């Protein structure tokens, strides 16, 4: 344990207020009563409640504070969950807290899927699954994590666990402007970032100076592209850059070498790729609540391209539901976006389908650029690199692209 860990900030929230590990321990010891549903606003309060459930071996449901009361009711969630009085206990120091959490029995964390294809589902995770690929050792004791994800979603929880179990500080960057994010990275000495490609594209559009103190940059949640990686290497020259694959249903499963993913040791036999679609064995999944029996193989909806079979290596090419049907021809929007961001000055792009009475849908693009808004030159550039059907019929220049609460690009 780092000397002085008690005084180290546990988290610095979006307003600049901090909660130290010493203060966290005091709150955990004094906590009464315990409620099994967390509908709090703010990462500091949310992660305090997760730490409480973890240290006491309890089950906790995290509910996004942006969910409306009727949506919560549809999920069968009782926001006024019964109170439970907790038995007294002591925490002499932070090391005792972390040891108690690592050996806690009975802890379960219930999360909601993003609900991008309907009402969210409830998925229960246990400590072993949530920490499957976390690294805890003395070499990580000085890491400072930027929290770029929604704290009620799987990616945010895993950033919390990686930081918390090493007694690291988290700096809340979620929902902040690019200028504020850059300022807070410098001010608080952030060394590790984990975020979606959309988050990085929005940030890089504003950042002009390198940030050499950042040592690790991880991308997840969406497909990335070589142009983004090149730009990340410019702004974060000291950082190791990697992609990760995680989902609310399964947690983190794959790491990457560039844009090529590989399963962690021991789970290769629990991965199947059929007709380009990634499937996971149900033993890798959390427990679905109220969904009946889950079939043996779970369809992730992710389309992949196999690079090698022994050992298994593959690339993600997009989400099955994101493909756009243009008069019978299916187009992967991420393929078009990858070409758009190759055009000089283009920092981000969104490709989507718009309803059309003749062909069903037409291909549209929104583009963020720091250069001249030359649509003709951009169309010529795309025409030289893509089949004609993949060149958007409608191109609109915009100042920013919409993103979801999970930090991903909104396509609908």
Model-derived features with residue positions:
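Conserved AMP-binding/adenylation subdomain of ANL enzymes
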Residues: 132-144, 152-191
């Amino acid at each position: 344990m780092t000397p002085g860990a008690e005084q180290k900030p546990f988290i610095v929230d979006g307003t600049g207020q901090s909660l130290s590990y010493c203060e966290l321990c005091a709150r955990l010891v004094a906590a009464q009563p315990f409620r099994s549903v967390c509908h709090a606003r703010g990462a500091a309060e949310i992660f305090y409640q997760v730490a409480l459930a973890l240290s006491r071996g309890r089950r906790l449901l995290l509910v996004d504070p942006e969910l409306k009361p009727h949506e919560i009711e549809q999920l069968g969630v009782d926001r006024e969950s019964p109170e439970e009085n907790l038995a007294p206990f002591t925490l002499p120091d932070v090391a005792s807290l972390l040891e108690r959490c690592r050996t806690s029995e009975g802890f379960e964390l219930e999360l909601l899927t993003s609900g991008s294809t309907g009402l969210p589902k409830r998925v229960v995770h246990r400590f072993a699954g949530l920490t499957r690929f976390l690294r805890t050792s003395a070499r990580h004791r000085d890491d400072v994590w930027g929290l770029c994800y929604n704290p009620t979603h799987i990616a945010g929880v895993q950033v919390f666990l990686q930081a918390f179990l090493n007694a690291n500080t988290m700096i809340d960057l979620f929902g902040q402007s690019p200028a504020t994010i850059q300022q807070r990275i410098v001010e608080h000495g952030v060394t590790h970032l984990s975020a979606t490609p959309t988050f990085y594209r929005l940030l890089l559009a504003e950042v002009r100076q390198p940030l050499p103190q950042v040592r690790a940059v991880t991308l997840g949640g969406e497909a990335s592209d070589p142009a983004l990686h090149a730009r990340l290497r410019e702004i974060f020259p000291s950082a190791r850059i990697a992609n990760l694959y995680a989902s609310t249903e399964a947690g983190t499963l794959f790491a990457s070498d560039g844009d090529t993913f590989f399963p962690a040791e021991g789970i290769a036999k629990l991965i199947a790729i059929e007709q380009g679609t990634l499937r996971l064995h149900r033993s890798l999944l959390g427990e679905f609540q109220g969904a009946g029996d889950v079939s043996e193989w779970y369809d992730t909806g992710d389309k992949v391209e196999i690079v090698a079979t022994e050992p298994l290596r593959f690339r993600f090419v997009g989400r099955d539901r994101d493909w756009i049907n243009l008069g019978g021809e299916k187009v992967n929007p991420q393929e078009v976006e990858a070409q758009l961001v190759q055009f000089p000055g283009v920092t981000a792009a969104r490709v989507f389908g718009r309803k059309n009475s003749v062909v069903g849908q037409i291909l549209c693009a929104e583009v963020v650029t720091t250069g001249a808004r030359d649509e003709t030159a951009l169309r010529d550039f795309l025409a030289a690199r893509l089949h004609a059907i993949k060149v958007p019929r409608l191109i609109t220049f915009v100042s920013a692209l919409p993103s979801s609460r999970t930090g991903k690009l909104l396509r609908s």
